[in-house]
């Protein structure tokens, strides 16, 4: 059951918005059962390493649901929340994958730097392409965001929608790139004594990145199917479709994620040379 509230604005025009959604059906039992089945399958077929990676996954989900989303709704700076999520997640994932070693520090540093650069570049590109970040899913719930009213009686926007879109894209890019970063650092650490350690590392990572993209790209592009159907249903022309704000924002998000995954290898290999080699040289001395 969707509860709809009806009101009038200052000009007397009637408007309606959904205020809450009630469901007479209890689904939690089935969802809990599916969670248990999923955990059992991970334990059986992914083994110890799979169970170990459930720790950061559960931590991250808890941070996003219990901390990030409520804080965003209350008006907390979205970029600060993004930084906190990426920082905590990178520490947890890198330490679990690489241990408490110099390699982990390198991987954490690379992930933080790449996320910062990602945000700056995406903001810049959006400004050049006149994209506001209003994606389909953001448009769907914007009506439910209650604006704040300050002491002067003026309405303030409760959330920066553009920043929200970039934060979502940055989180997706981070989780797509962090396995690539950790694996690149691990491989470079094994090859650092060779003459062409960086080149050898990049060459060995090419197949891994290709497999990663084959998995990620089709999955991401399926997300734009509802938006594309919406434009087709509204009989938009080809020019209107390719210039659509809703579709364009999603495509830009996907392409930036792909770029992050691809660039994670050379950036990680070069950062690994600067830091791992220094630690290696210090041990020799």
Per-range role (PLM):
Residues 137-151, 186-200, 257:
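Juxtamembrane inter-helical linkers in multi-pass membrane proteins
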Residues 174-191:
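Membrane-embedded alpha-helices of multi-pass transport/permease systems
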Residues 221-285:
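Hydrophobic alpha-helical transmembrane segments of membrane transport and translocation systems
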Residues 20-28, 47, 51, 55, ...:
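Alpha-helical membrane-interface segments at transmembrane helix boundaries
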Residues 110-114, 148, 153-171, 207, ...:
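Pore-lining and gate-forming transmembrane alpha-helices of multi-pass membrane transport proteins
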